[in-house]
């Protein structure tokens, strides 16, 4: 499809949507962010499931719509042992939790100095991990489009985040 080897990827990590482009010696091509979809952008959302499944974009939204209602009560949760202490904050609050999370607004959270992680299933998900779910999905799309495994990435960021003085 492309002549020449790609030299870098460029990512626009947006609040709502993100995009990726492949840079060659003589040109830059924005590539579809999700295989099989006509759009060039990927929804900047991360899906987390207690079993370790991680998704980004439309796949994240679709998975959450199908599985978002599933939950565990603490009596049936492998993270909480009868009579034992637990790191699960949900167990101490209301005795149950959802099996899935759809994390939105990750870019907004980057601007917050008081936010470093979100907590689910007795574990903290660092902000960098949430961002990486989206970035890794974008990279897979660019690898598929370019036929290469490019390791060089260019990303910009706002000089000042909206709402910050």
Placement of each model-derived feature along the sequence:
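Phosphate-binding loop and its immediate beta->loop->alpha context
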Residues: 26-165
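Gly/Thr-rich phosphate-binding beta-strand-loop-beta motif of the actin/hexokinase/Hsp70
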Residues: 2-31
């Amino acid at each position: 499809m492309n002549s020449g080897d790609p030299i870098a990827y460029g990512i626009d990590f947006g609040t709502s949507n993100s995009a990726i482009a492949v840079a060659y010696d003589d040109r830059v091509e924005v590539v579809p962010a999700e295989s099989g979809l006509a759009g060039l952008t990927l929804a900047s959302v991360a899906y987390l499931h207690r079993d370790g499944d991680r998704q980004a974009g439309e796949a994240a939204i679709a998975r959450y719509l199908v599985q978002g209602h599933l939950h565990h009560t603490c009596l049936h949760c492998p993270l909480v042992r009868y009579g034992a202490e637990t790191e699960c904050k949900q167990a101490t609050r209301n005795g149950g939790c959802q099996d899935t999370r759809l994390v939105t607004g990750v870019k907004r959270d980057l601007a917050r100095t008081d936010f470093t992680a979100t907590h689910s299933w007795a574990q903290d998900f660092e902000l960098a991990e949430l961002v990486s779910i989206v970035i890794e999905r974008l990279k897979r799309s660019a690898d598929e489009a370019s036929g290469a495994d490019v390791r060089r990435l260019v990303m910009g960021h706002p000089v000042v985040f909206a709402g910050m003085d």
